[in-house]
């Protein structure tokens, strides 16, 4: 059975008044610039200091959106493309957004001395409660990529009451096996640090094409003044412990797993999905996204993120302004309901008055 898609016209929430003064416009522009820059803080934790950037004035009734980046990146290079994306503004204007840089990874970070004992992945996750306490955040929605996804996963398992939702991009819940360990030892002999990290971040197809994005990140890593810090973070991630996820030891909140088709951690994400509660987990496998979907497909990830937040009870469907106006999009998906049966369904933003796709009560696999 097919459903006819209809175009929905929605007016601006706050249309510009004809007589609005230039002074008001200038004040709005100045406020927008300040919001884009964010407020930077240094937060003391039991395992050292963290560099934290906060955007937005805060809403005590809603969780903060808290992000942690991957190895070889900082919060800006990992998340600016996504969170500055035009359609994402419909989301971020309703939440406080908090970007955490892993120890020593922020732009301009001092280089650690030789022999410095870098924090383990578990210890980095233990630094997060101090951040929540510093800003008086009661709960968060975590958004992590790669190593950041692992850190947020560990934090959520240890502090389930503090996390209302998780978006995990390229998550690998497993510790390295002997084969991985041997492969890394061989890689150390034949590949530079930047090559190892680039292979961690991007798919083989992207590496073969040597895209401009890869060239930019390779140059940034190679020329980074804090290259030693990056290496320490990389080694810490390689030494991570197994999260030991299973249906009896899993997240208590809605989770959205995201991975690019043919991405380095595609198999790990699929395995992680099999270990989570199917009634609270959504799984998105994004075509043509490569290893960094937040950089290559910000529009599709924004769309999925908004549905995820709406499924949690925030931002009702009536708030769909830019996302509804910009285009009518159909997503083909297959999902299992209560683990007992599966079916196919076409999800449309613009049909039937803006009906939403399945909430986090379903496991959904989407090829965008």
Curated annotation (Swiss-Prot):
Keyword Isomerase present in the record's keywords: the answer is: no
> Which is one Gene Ontology cellular component term of this protein?
cytoplasm
Q: Which family does it belong to?
A: Belongs to the NDRG family.
Q: Which organism encodes this protein?
A: Danio rerio (Zebrafish)
Which pairs are disulfide-linked?
Answer: none
Alphabetical list of InterPro entries matching this protein: AB_hydrolase_fold, NDRG
Positions with biased composition (Low complexity): 330-339
* Xref: Pfam families: Ndr
**Region Disordered: start and end of each range?**
330-368
Looking at the UniProt entry, the stretches that span the membrane are none
Which GO BP annotation is one of this protein's?
A: Wnt signaling pathway
What Gene3D superfamilies does the database record attribute to this sequence? Answer: alpha/beta hydrolase
Indicate what this protein is called per its UniProt record: Protein NDRG2
What the protein does? Contributes to the regulation of the Wnt signaling pathway. Down-regulates CTNNB1-mediated transcriptional activation of target genes. May be involved in neuron differentiation.
Its keywords, alphabetically, are:
Cytoplasm, Developmental protein, Differentiation, Neurogenesis, Wnt signaling pathway
Q: Does the keyword Lyase apply?
A: no
Q: Where is the protein situated, by its record's location annotation?
A: Cytoplasm
